């Protein structure tokens, strides 16, 4: 199971401004997930365009007519039998990217997608069967997952940058320049 969700169009780094909602329905014991605007579209998730079957989705938690801020939910996005998107889920491919094309990045919109209550990640905060919200001991814990994932991307990209720099330095150390004057056989080596 490949679980990744990274960005949304409206956010940048302002996680509290997240537009995606997860509204708890105590009658059915389900959360209803929505991306109510175009800017709430989940954007750039790795593996989402063609391969991922599940995603960790961050959404504003609503229960008992009150918003409790961003929380994580596990969402199945594709059928495990024929790999088609599930009802209410619109998936797309964001196309070519500069420097990170090997990752299958996509987009996702949600329209009244219902998931069971137990698909909310409830290690630090909880929603009881009747919809009562139990807050985490430390409210900053909710932001740890997003911060960790962003740090991992920086670490991965720094490895790519180090490899590219090594190739560039090695190539420039042995590269021959063109003739300074036609017919002159003197070559200059470029060294950094």
Where do the language-model regions lie?
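Non-transmembrane, amphipathic alpha-helical segments
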Residues: 102, 146-153
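Generic, well-ordered alpha-helical scaffold segments in large soluble proteins
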Residues: 21, 60, 76, 109, ...
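Sensory/regulatory domains in signal-transduction proteins
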Residues: 6-14, 39-41
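Short Gly/Pro-enriched turn/cap motifs at secondary-structure boundaries
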Residues: 10-13, 97-101
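A short core secondary-structure module
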Residues: 26, 30-90
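A glycine-rich, basic-preceded beta-loop-alpha segment at the flavin cofactor/substrate interface
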Residues: 45-47, 83, 92, 109-149, ...
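Short Pro/Gly-enriched beta-strand edge/turn motifs at strand-loop
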Residues: 2-6, 88-92
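Generic recognition of stable, solvent-exposed alpha-helical segments in well-folded globular domains
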Residues: 17, 52, 56, 68, ...
